[in-house]
Amino acid sequence: QVRPFPDVYQRSACQARETLVSILQEYPDEISDIFRPSCVAVLRCSGCCTDESLKCTPVGKHTVDMQIMRVNPRTQSSKMEVMKFTEHTACECRPRRKQGEPDGPKEKPR
């Protein structure tokens, strides 16, 4: 069965969608411990824009608290803790940064 164009177009649009992100990618300084789960599902902007010069960009964000198990591999001890993650609440197609322009601040949920 062929998926109709309006459905294809809508599903590919720039929007916040559930995305799996690695906890260590979000918290790179926490490399000495193991996390369970090792990744979490959060809403992040992704999708296609109508022009290659545009990029799907978050224009609204909020922080969500998630309970994660932290395991210390040296002592084999574990504890539950609350970690903060950034979720995107609104997305827009915005102009891409030109090469050589400085990056903005790294997205940190803390």
Curated annotation (Swiss-Prot):
Disulfide bonds join 14-56, 45-91, 49-93. Signal peptide: none annotated. Pfam families: PDGF. Its main location: secreted. It comes from the Eukaryota. InterPro entries: Cystine-knot_cytokine, PD_growth_factor_CS, PDGF/VEGF_dom, PDGF/VEGF_growth_factor. Expressed by the venom gland. GO terms for biological process: induction of positive chemotaxis; positive regulation of angiogenesis; positive regulation of endothelial cell proliferation; positive regulation of mast cell chemotaxis; response to hypoxia; sprouting angiogenesis; vascular endothelial growth factor receptor signaling pathway; vascular endothelial growth factor signaling pathway. The modification Pyrrolidone carboxylic acid is found at residue 1. GO terms for cellular component: extracellular space; membrane. GO terms for molecular function: chemoattractant activity; growth factor activity; toxin activity; vascular endothelial growth factor receptor binding. It is found in: Secreted. The keyword Secreted applies. Keywords: Disulfide bond, Growth factor, Pyrrolidone carboxylic acid, Secreted, Toxin. PANTHER family: VASCULAR ENDOTHELIAL GROWTH FACTOR (PTHR12025), VASCULAR ENDOTHELIAL GROWTH FACTOR A, LONG FORM (PTHR12025:SF5). Belongs to the PDGF/VEGF growth factor family. Snake venom VEGF subfamily. Homodimer; disulfide-linked. Interacts with high affinity with KDR/VEGFR-2, and with a lower affinity with neuropilin-1 (NRP1) and neuropilin-2 (NRP2). Snake venom VEGFs may contribute to venom dispersion and prey subjugation by inducing vascular permeability and hypotension. This protein increases vascular permeability and angiogenesis probably through VEGF receptor (KDR/VEGFR-2) signaling. Induces DNA synthesis in human umbilical vein endothelial cells, and promotes mouse embryonic stem cell proliferation and differentiation. It may also induce a drastic hypotensive effect after intravenous injection. The hypotension is mediated by nitric oxide (NO), which is produced by VEGF-activated endothelium NO synthase. This is Snake venom vascular endothelial growth factor toxin ICPP.
